[in-house]
């Protein structure tokens, strides 16, 4: 009852709302005293207006003019207030419920840099980005995708810096999605990516707010999805997949060294087993005599050819890696380490594989973990098996043919219109300062020019530090 003659209905779903807001800002305001003296009308619509403007102490209140949005508003965690005799209502924001706090990201860890990571709450995530980019030009475009789940999706970009055509293309692709459910950002990624049948990612993901902020400041667009800590970044080039946010927090020479190390490790993880197969099977003359004799002695008594040996070891390691990921955390690392040691040693002693092959597979596995992006590391895992088959059939000529085909494929990839090998194909000298090599911050005057044609300048020139003249 509200007053003496009016019946109110306060509707919400327990578990989706903030109970403190319900109790103190809604229920207490409506039931703490008799409002008959303050109501000068008996019209239900006017009473709702009085309740909205005078009695509710909540920051976000809106009118419910028809019943269609009622269910969706309640399911989002809002509270709906209805009064007997009126077809209108009031929607009071009371979104709450249990959620995980801001913690250090489980992936893409850094030694130096912010330790905060995204959560499963999209509003918490957008707030984390706004805390880093305090600009009114940081725009957020909201969408609801999924006929059943009605998942909140937020597209974030800097107006005036991001390419308007790319922003509109992303929004158009999001609007074309017609499916029952969106439970994670991976759904969105597969629906909007340029090319489906490629092992290389054309959209990257991260759970680091600083990585999203840095990408937005370069003119890229971020896509956040409610219910997951992983946000998407587009457009990207392949070289961005080898860069870590920590590269920008330490000296440029160390960052450059680490970038080159990651690229070399990617090539090693992709090609090392196939090179071993090709050389040991077809091109033994390329090895020094001492090394060749050592490898031949190790392979004496091995019943399998090198390609079968390598495939068996690689598949075994993939099984161990997957088991380590799926097992409880306390047991996963132990299974991976102990399983690899025990199986490797037992296989060598049983004469099933050579010691050299165990070393090759182990070093390949270690190199695959160097890449900061899980997506590009997974690409190397898939391509590794293809190159091993080429090496077993055609030797080094097969590996070179595979590399040429891969290069042609990379040259044809696009990420929302951006060539995947930018700034090398097409070659843009001005953008070389933050690709393989990272120059000092005072030298990075412009943003990537192919993305930012209208506002490419990042900072003023001539900021190189110099020692002061103490005699003046």
Language-model regions: role of each:
Residues 275-278, 288-472:
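Generic detector of multi-pass transmembrane helix bundles and their immediately adjacent loops
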Residues 1-271, 285, 289, 409-472:
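Membrane-embedded alpha-helical signal segments
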């Amino acid at each position: 009852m509200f007053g003496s003659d009016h019946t109110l209905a306060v509707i919400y779903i327990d578990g989706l709302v903030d109970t403190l807001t319900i109790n103190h800002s809604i229920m207490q305001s409506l039931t703490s005293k008799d409002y008959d003296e303050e109501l000068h009308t008996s019209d239900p619509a006017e009473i709702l207006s009085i309740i909205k403007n005078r009695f509710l102490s909540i920051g976000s209140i809106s009118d419910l003019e028809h019943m269609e949005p009622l269910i969706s508003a309640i399911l989002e965690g809002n509270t709906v207030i209805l009064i007997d005799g009126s077809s209108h209502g009031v929607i009071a924001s009371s979104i709450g419920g249990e959620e995980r706090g801001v913690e250090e990201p489980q992936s893409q860890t850094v030694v130096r840099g912010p330790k905060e990571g995204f959560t499963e709450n999209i509003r918490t995530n957008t707030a984390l980005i706004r805390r880093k980019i305090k600009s009114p030009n940081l725009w957020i475009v909201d969408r609801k995708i999924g006929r059943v789940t009605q998942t909140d999706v937020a597209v974030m970009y800097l107006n005036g810096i991001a390419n308007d055509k790319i922003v509109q293309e992303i929004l158009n692709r999001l609007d074309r999605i017609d499916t029952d459910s969106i439970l994670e950002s991976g759904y969105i990624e597969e629906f909007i990516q340029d090319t489906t049948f490629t092992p290389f990612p054309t959209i990257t993901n991260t759970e680091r707010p600083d990585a999203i902020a840095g990408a937005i400041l370069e003119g890229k667009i971020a896509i956040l999805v409610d219910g997951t800590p992983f946000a998407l970044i587009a457009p990207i080039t392949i070289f961005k997949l080898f860069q870590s946010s920590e590269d920008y927090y330490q000296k440029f020479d160390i960052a450059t060294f680490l970038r080159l190390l990651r690229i070399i490790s990617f090539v090693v993880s992709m090609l090392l087993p196939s090179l071993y197969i090709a050389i040991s099977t077809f091109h033994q003359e390329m090895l020094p005599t001492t090394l060749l004799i050592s490898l031949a002695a190790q392979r004496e008594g091995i019943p399998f050819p090198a390609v079968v040996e390598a495939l068996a070891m690689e598949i075994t390691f993939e099984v161990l890696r997957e088991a380590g990921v799926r097992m409880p955390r306390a047991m996963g690392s132990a299974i991976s380490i102990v399983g690899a040691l025990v199986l490797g040693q037992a296989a060598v002693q049983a004469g099933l594989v050579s010691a050299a092959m165990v070393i090759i597979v182990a070093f390949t596995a270690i190199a695959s973990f160097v890449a900061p992006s899980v997506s590009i590391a997974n690409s190397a895992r898939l391509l590794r098996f293809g190159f091993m088959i080429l090496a077993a059939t055609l030797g080094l000529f097969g590996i070179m043919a595979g590399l040429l085909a891969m290069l042609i494929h990379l040259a044809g990839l696009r990420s929302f219109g951006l060539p995947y090998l930018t700034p090398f194909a097409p070659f843009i000298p001005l953008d070389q300062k933050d690709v393989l090599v990272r120059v000092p911050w005072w030298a990075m005057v412009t943003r990537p020019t192919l993305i930012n044609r209208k506002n490419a300048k990042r900072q003023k020139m001539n900021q190189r530090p110099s020692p002061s003249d103490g005699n003046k």
